[in-house]
């Protein structure tokens, strides 16, 4: 009887693979078609964001956050603004809080639509992404009408938002909700009820409650395992404690459960959007959209045409910026991909001393090796899709 030495072979997945979610390079060690080891190589989109922020004023640093998770930009700005507001003790007007809450939920729809439909494309269904991008286009137009930009909005400000929403935009957001829910139902039938989609996703990448905690997962990754942990409920910020919505949780902790949760979260986001629209129309929802503290918010433009003091105030605010009291703070938001946190250290000057960004995708990607082990090569893209990785925030 002859002996054969069976040697595992290694292949590269990415960084230019369509399912690699950006610039991910995975070095896969395979025994036949079974995955033995996954080695993620990150850093191909590293831009030194945290260091760049240290050399910018607080206002100039805000646009960097759009470029982290570029699928849902405003959610990232939100965490940075919350951190500054907590350090400086800035009070945000109610209308600004409502607008922020509304656009964070629009960001959640943008992210989940992309993830669920491209997950279907990764397993071979080509129609859902076309439907998803059609809806995302409408949401991006809302972004554009609010901030002037489709993608990198730079709309949130410490103390509020940049501009008020026109009444027609609020009406259009309300009109968007009902037809969108029908599209979600159609996607449910087309994707979630599809037997091939189920065969490819059920019992793949199972994560238990203890494992989710041990790996430092957040967002859909913990809710898929049955833990109802959502910062909007457990540590409410802005006006989420006033909103009525449910937290969908899974029971199997597999890839399929996580995608079902994303579908349900889109329905819950629409609920929150409707409540925000209703509250924006109430008398209590009227008023300023930025802090009335002149140290942090610029004067109205009409005043700058008449008042020399207002012009000087505006000039100082946009050249030197405002000074944040010395201290350190951690602010986190429930971004679509998980807990997005900003640890901000101020030395009392007009620039952050240190700004550490806690990206949810970074914690999720480290579990790639453990989740894929023993699965087939074809399942790697399913597991990667369910982690919902965006490389802007992983590499920073």
Curated annotation (Swiss-Prot):
GO terms for cellular component: plasma membrane. GO terms for molecular function: NAD binding; NADH:ubiquinone reductase (non-electrogenic) activity; quinone binding. Its main location: membrane. Keywords: Cell inner membrane, Cell membrane, Membrane, NAD, Quinone, Translocase, Transport, Ubiquinone. It is found in: Cell inner membrane. It holds the Pfam family Complex1_49kDa. The keyword Membrane applies. It catalyses: a quinone + NADH + 5 H(+)(in) = a quinol + NAD(+) + 4 H(+)(out). Its EC number is 7.1.1.-. It is a peripheral membrane protein. NDH-1 is composed of 14 different subunits. Subunits NuoB, C, D, E, F, and G constitute the peripheral sector of the complex. Belongs to the complex I 49 kDa subunit family. NDH-1 shuttles electrons from NADH, via FMN and iron-sulfur (Fe-S) centers, to quinones in the respiratory chain. The immediate electron acceptor for the enzyme in this species is believed to be ubiquinone. Couples the redox reaction to proton translocation (for every two electrons transferred, four hydrogen ions are translocated across the cytoplasmic membrane), and thus conserves the redox energy in a proton gradient. This is NADH-quinone oxidoreductase subunit D. It comes from Methylorubrum extorquens (strain PA1). The lineage of its organism: Bacteria, Pseudomonadati, Pseudomonadota, Alphaproteobacteria, Hyphomicrobiales. The gene is nuoD.
């Amino acid at each position: 009887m002859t002996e054969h030495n069976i040697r595992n072979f290694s292949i590269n997945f990415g960084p230019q693979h369509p399912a690699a979610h950006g610039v991910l390079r995975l070095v896969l060690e395979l025994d036949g078609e079974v995955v033995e080891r996954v080695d993620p190589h990150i850093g191909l989109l590293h831009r030194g964001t945290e260091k760049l922020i240290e050399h910018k004023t607080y206002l100039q640093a805000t646009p960097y956050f759009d470029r982290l998770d570029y699928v849902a930009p405003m959610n990232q700005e939100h965490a940075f603004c919350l951190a500054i507001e907590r350090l400086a003790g800035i009070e945000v007007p109610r209308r600004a809080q409502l607008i922020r809450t509304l656009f964070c939920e629009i960001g959640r729809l943008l992210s989940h639509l992309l993830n669920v439909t491209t997950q279907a494309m990764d397993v071979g269904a080509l129609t859902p992404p076309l439907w998803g991008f059609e809806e995302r286009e409408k949401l991006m137009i809302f972004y554009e009408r609010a901030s002037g930009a489709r993608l990198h909005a730079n709309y949130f400000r410490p103390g509020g938002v940049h501009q008020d929403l026109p009444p027609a935009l609020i009406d259009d957001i309300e009109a968007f909700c009902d037809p969108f829910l029908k599209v979600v139902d159609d996607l449910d039938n087309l994707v979630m009820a599809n037997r091939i989609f189920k065969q490819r996703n059920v019992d793949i990448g199972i994560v238990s409650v203890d494992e989710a905690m041990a790996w430092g997962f957040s967002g859909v990754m913990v809710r898929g395992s049955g833990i109802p942990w959502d910062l909007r409920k457990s540590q409410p910020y802005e006006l989420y404690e006033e909103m009525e919505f449910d937290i969908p949780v899974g029971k199997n902790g597999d890839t399929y459960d996580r995608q079902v949760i994303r579908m349900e979260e889109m329905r819950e986001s629409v609920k929150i959007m409707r409540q925000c629209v209703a509250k924006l129309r109430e008398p209590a929802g009227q008023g300023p959209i930025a802090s009335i503290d002149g140290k942090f918010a610029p004067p109205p433009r009409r005043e700058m045409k008449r008042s020399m003091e207002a012009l000087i105030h505006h000039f100082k605010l946009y050249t030197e910026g405002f000074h944040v009291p010395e201290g350190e703070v951690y602010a986190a938001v429930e971004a679509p991909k998980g807990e997005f946190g900003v640890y901000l250290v101020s030395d009392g000057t007009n620039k952050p001393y240190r700004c550490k960004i806690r990206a949810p995708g970074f914690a999720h990607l480290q579990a790639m090796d453990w989740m894929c082990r023993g699965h087939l090569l074809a399942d790697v893209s399913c597991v990667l899709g369910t982690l919902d990785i965006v490389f802007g925030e992983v590499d920073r």
